[in-house]
Amino acid sequence: MNEDGSVCNKILIAFQDNDQIANLKESVLGEVFRLDKANTNHDENIIKGLTWSTKYYEVRYDLYVDTFDDFEEWCKDLISSEYDDLREVLSGIIVIDSYTMEKDKIDQNKLLGQLGSVLQDKFFVFMNTNKDISQDVIDELNDDNSMQLTSDSGNSVEIINYHNVSNLKLNQYNEKIGFERVREIIDTCEWSGGHRVQTVEAKADSTDVDLESVFNRLKEARLKYLEIEDEDEREQFALEISNEFAEFLQ
Amino acid sequence: MTQIKYMLLISRQGKVRLQKWYVSLPNNEKTKIIRNLTSIVLSRKAKMCNIVEFGDHKVVYKRYASLYFVCGITQEVDNELLTLEVIHRFVETMDTYFGNVCELDIIFNFEKAYNILDDMLMCDGSLAESSKKEILNHVKTMDTMEHNDHLDRVLS
């Protein structure tokens, strides 16, 4: 909860601690969260007071940045009851690590499944930094039943490639990939609080606005405006009318 | 002839974004169908068949980007391929209405998506209107009436 009483959401992002971490941090924080290195200290562990904006809403959130040496250990810590409070306040988790297709794959899948199962109604993204895994393999992994371990709770991990080797913008399902997909997942996650921004409503193509009716209504509005004595009230009325007409004419 | 039993829209994250039931079922039965279908449909791979036998009926689904459109159909009456066309027409109509529709558009304008669906399918699940142009005209008329109503409210 913020000082003004509004709810502040939290996203946890965890990087594997290696010599690439500075580059990874910069690109993920820049591409996904639009955090410019010039304006934000990427070395901070908690970046507060950020705003996530879409064409429909704006919401405030804090970004928790973490690193790990051993994913298994980090995962087990986060699953443990000691971290119940932290998990409770999170809107979602993004893990940036290399996905392994070799013998320890099952353990990695198992860990992802375990973590996903304790993240009810929160998004969970695993960003794979392993260049050898193609987009088609990632799609298959995501389709694979073993990755949908937590579908009962309406939650599952989604693996997304960090590197866009093929330079594609969409996968075989016409779904966004890479950073854009991470943004899409965050866009549609369940935030707390937030407010809707004034939007231009979607509307079917049409040019046949009844102008006569618009003018009649304008006349009517002007007469009513002139009748209002209180200046503030008049201004308020004028503002409401202009908004309504703008929407009507779009 | 179509007699769709239900139409569900499920996201890749397993969230139900739209649900329309054309048969009367108790709530717990609906929840069970949604839960089972979510795990069945999400786990199917790209090259698998889009028609699945499910309990006493068939399910036809199609994936568009990160959204799965799932229809339960009456086996004796419905044609599976026609159902796929109904789904596609619904998606095309939403795409034209919203202009490259995405999940967020549906979340924040779900009533418009339901309006389009209601124009296409009658309350018994049969096809009422197949023309995209006609459906968009109807929805546009509803939008105009809604805006007029807002204006009237401000002016009154």
Curated annotation (Swiss-Prot), chain A:
Look up keyword Magnesium and say if it applies.
Answer: no
| Pfam families linked to this entry | Adaptin_binding
Q: Which GO terms describe its molecular function?
A: protein-macromolecule adaptor activity
Record carries keyword Transmembrane:
no
Report keywords, A-Z.
Chromosomal rearrangement
Check the record and name the InterPro entries matching this protein: Irc6
Please indicate which superkingdom the organism of origin belongs to.
Eukaryota
Q: Which GO terms describe its biological process?
A: vesicle-mediated transport
Regarding protein family, the annotation reads:
Belongs to the IRC6 family.
The name of this protein is Increased recombination centers protein 6
- Organism for this UniProt entry: Vanderwaltozyma polyspora (strain ATCC 22028 / DSM 70294 / BCRC 21397 / CBS 2163 / NBRC 10782 / NRRL Y-8283 / UCD 57-17)
Q: Which gene encodes it?
A: IRC6
